[in-house]
Regions:
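Metal-ion/cofactor- or nucleotide/acyl-coenzyme-handling active-site neighborhoods
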Residues: 2-241
Length: 241
């Protein structure tokens, strides 16, 4: 759904990341021109359906291992639950110097109770009762998608979130602590939950001053980076697994 949202804003991403292996995700690519997909680099979990992989050019296709490791010499365990944390960890591990997080709010719209953007196909209709604050003194069961918590905000003092989002926040914080190097800067442009050691960033007008990026040169640099940190064959001991 994120890809459709970007294309609707006339943004063609250089990289697309997929975590889930469900075949139904193939439907998310319907309506997208094949010529556009051929321009993009795909970072895909090894369990992603082959119909999706075939939408992309082979030279732009890079697989990573998440649930289990076969190529332990180059693979590391990826700790994210969702595609957001997974992509974030990969970019940190690859040494990207500046990372800007967009749409990483992990909070509830306090007016409407929405948990997802309208563009989200499966969760856009989700609503929570923002008055239903969770008390840990209660011994009742916790509904991770409905019960509400108050956490520190990125641009405001506090925001409301769900216990599910709280898990994701903790996951981002753990990944940052474990993989972020001193020379890396990470900025959160989302009006939502605060993430540790990640700087709030709202100066969007500053981007208008940046020089236009030569997308062809960038594509070649990214392909070179991913190729140098990848392998395209199995060793004998790996074939036996």
């Amino acid at each position: 759904q994120c890809l459709h949202r970007l294309l609707n804003e006339n943004i063609i991403p250089d990289i697309v990341t997929i975590v889930d292996g469900e075949k139904i995700l193939y439907n998310d690519f319907k309506g997208i021109k094949n010529s556009l997909l051929k321009q993009m680099i795909l970072l895909a979990n090894v369990n992603v359906d082959s119909k999706i992989l075939n939408l992309f050019t082979n030279k732009n296709l890079f697989l990573y291992e998440k649930e289990f490791l076969i190529k332990s010499n180059i693979s590391k365990y990826l700790e994210g639950f969702t595609v957001g944390e997974t992509t974030y960890q990969i970019f940190l591990m690859l040494g990207f110097r500046e990372i800007y997080l967009v749409g990483t709010d992990m909070s509830i719209d306090e007016t409407s109770g929405k948990t997802h953007d309208e563009m989200h196909k499966y969760s856009s209709k989700n609503r929570v009762n923002t008055n239903k604050k969770l008390s840990y003194r209660k011994k009742s069961k916790i509904n991770q998608n409905k019960d509400v918590l108050t956490v520190e905000g990125n641009f405001t003092k506090n925001v409301l979130t769900t216990t599910f989002y709280s898990r994701l926040i903790n996951n981002y914080n753990r990944i940052t602590l474990k993989y972020k190097m001193n020379e890396q800067e990470v900025y959160n442009m989302s009006d939502g939950a605060k993430l540790k050691d990640i700087k709030p960033y709202s100066k969007i007008k500053r981007f208008y001053k940046y020089k236009l990026i030569d997308k062809n040169k960038l594509h070649k640099k990214l392909i070179k980076l991913f190729t140098e940190t990848s392998e395209n064959k199995f060793e004998n001991n790996e074939k036996q697994m």
